[in-house]
């Protein structure tokens, strides 16, 4: 919780560590991804996957999901207490794709959760290695962010579908810890809080008794996490009001929606980490790379360098475009679903196009899809440059608001203007400024109105050549100032359904 004085870096959150110096952080993050790699290699051996099959991203995802399910204690306990037909609570599995006689075939596998836990611990020096599990969750979350739209979820909680850029991490499980909280967008936190308040409105006992006390603690903790994401005093003060409310109700929901809208211009600080599929770490470990000795960072050059040298394959449906599939996975790998397309295109070195123009569906293949017509192709995950990932929202000069296009949450620390339609955003703020938060609301609206779309964010920050690992020569790109920025314009993606 940022508000409690100790700022830990992402990597410390990621590895559950106390304050460490840069070298120790690099080593512990290295140990974490090395453990994922060793686990993946062992699973490929168990499943007798060929080299090609082990590089298939769909197989990687199945293996990742199996280990996440094996360690999901709450769900395991629930499954044992509520046995459902055809679900063995002690087993986990999924589709594994193999190459047979020039065709891809799907094989459903089933493993004891206990066995998976044993393999995972063995790969992680006998520890539970929760940080590695969280890392996999964040990779899945980043993939969902790039693949699906959350319009329905937004509308259900009374928010506007145009706030999609605030929804990073909306599919992360509750158990994703501090590292998970760091990558959640403002909209995601608001949505979780609104759901909680709505339950309280509909269920009289929600805040009462021993359980209610725990609920209340969770509520206040979530409020503090959200407060820590805001960068202006007025937004934080409003969060204090929401947190201290005796019994949260519609007034708090209104305040939260107001705050979410304000975050389109007064953006929150949301962390971005490049989390790669397990097979990528597996390939590196198999080739003899020692992550712990070399050190690793999720926010620097390392993931770019790893992707430069990894060949990953994906199954492709008959009318999908392999280049588009590659873009989807590239964005997921760098947590760039909400980044300005001009910036992503520059870094990647090929044009990154809005989702509405992509001829590709999600990466995962449903069990009822026909395998006969499935092909596979290499994912192009390399980049022309690398850039440092940011956790700031890109607001200019500290506390003052800057422009935020209606759907951008910057991923890379690279100089750009943040084009936005102030009229569109401000239209949502007419009227209601009375009530107990009126002065804060007025202050927030004033800051938003003084924001200028032509202001430059991340002044002087640039991208770096892949040979420049110490980040000595920033190349500051110049972008045209047009409104070219959002991945979600003209969106026709599928909804995310659990």
UniProtKB/Swiss-Prot annotation:
One of its GO terms (molecular function) is structural molecule activity. Pfam families: Flu_NP. Belongs to the influenza viruses nucleoprotein family. GO terms for biological process: symbiont entry into host cell; viral penetration into host nucleus. This is Nucleoprotein. InterPro entries: Flu_NP. Coiled coil: none annotated. Keywords: Capsid protein, Helical capsid protein, Host nucleus, Host-virus interaction, Ribonucleoprotein, RNA-binding, Viral nucleoprotein, Viral penetration into host nucleus, Virion, Virus entry into host cell. Its main location: virion. A motif (Bipartite nuclear localization signal) lies at residues 198-216. A motif (Unconventional nuclear localization signal) lies at residues 1-18. The keyword Lyase does not apply. Residues 1-21 are annotated as: Disordered. Encapsidates the negative strand viral RNA, protecting it from nucleases. The encapsidated genomic RNA is termed the ribonucleoprotein (RNP) and serves as template for transcription and replication. The RNP needs to be localized in the host nucleus to start an infectious cycle, but is too large to diffuse through the nuclear pore complex. NP comprises at least 2 nuclear localization signals that are responsible for the active RNP import into the nucleus through cellular importin alpha/beta pathway. Late in virus-infected cells, may be cleaved from a 56-kDa protein to a 53-kDa protein by a cellular caspase. This cleavage might be a marker for the onset of apoptosis in infected cells or have a specific function in virus host interaction. The gene is NP. Homomultimerizes to form the nucleocapsid. May bind host exportin-1/XPO1. Binds to viral genomic RNA. Protein-RNA contacts are mediated by a combination of electrostatic interactions between positively charged residues and the phosphate backbone and planar interactions between aromatic side chains and bases. GO terms for cellular component: helical viral capsid; host cell; host cell nucleus; ribonucleoprotein complex; viral nucleocapsid. The keyword Phosphoprotein does not apply. Disulfide bonds: none annotated. Signal peptide: none annotated. It is found in: Virion; Host nucleus.
